[in-house]
């Protein structure tokens, strides 16, 4: 299955919305896994803690990469959105800029906990990880608001 999110006559709107929600849920699950890893005990075995954080970050990085592909890529959500509502180009540009910022935060954290067993300051990694999760949360909220404004479709909630 490709990463295109483009609704077409062969892919009804409902399927498009379901796929969008499914992918949002995957990203949210990755965010939750990172939150749990960051909150885990670290003082006694920092190497194991760092490895759990690294594994969660690798998964988050992959899911975020898919998010960028389905929003910015050919046939992606942002192209469809701009065709439907060109007035929202400023909001699309903002979300696109956020992708680069968030990617940088993910990459920085991965460097701090790689290779496994890296002796990085736990509190600093937690602070940076928490800041990353906050950025992702706000990005998701803005994305949900944008889709609703363009299409009057609520993609925000996951069950």
For every predicted segment, state its role.
Residues 1-159:
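Small-residue-biased structural context
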């Amino acid at each position: 299955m490709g990463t295109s999110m483009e609704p077409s006559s062969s892919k009804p709107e409902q399927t498009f919305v379901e796929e969008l929600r499914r992918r949002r849920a995957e990203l949210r699950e990755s965010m939750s896994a990172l939150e749990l890893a960051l909150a885990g005990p670290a003082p006694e075995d920092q190497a194991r803690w760092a490895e759990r954080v690294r594994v969660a970050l690798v998964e988050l990085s992959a899911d975020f990469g898919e998010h960028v592909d389905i929003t910015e890529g050919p046939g992606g959500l942002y192209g469809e959105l701009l065709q439907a509502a060109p007035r929202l180009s400023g909001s699309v540009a903002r979300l696109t800029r956020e992708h680069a910022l968030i990617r940088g935060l993910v990459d920085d954290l991965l460097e701090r906990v790689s290779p496994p067993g890296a002796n990085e300051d736990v509190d600093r990694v937690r602070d940076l990880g928490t800041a990353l999760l906050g950025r992702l949360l706000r990005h998701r909220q803005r994305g949900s608001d944008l889709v609703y404004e363009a299409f009057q479709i609520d993609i925000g909630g996951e069950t």
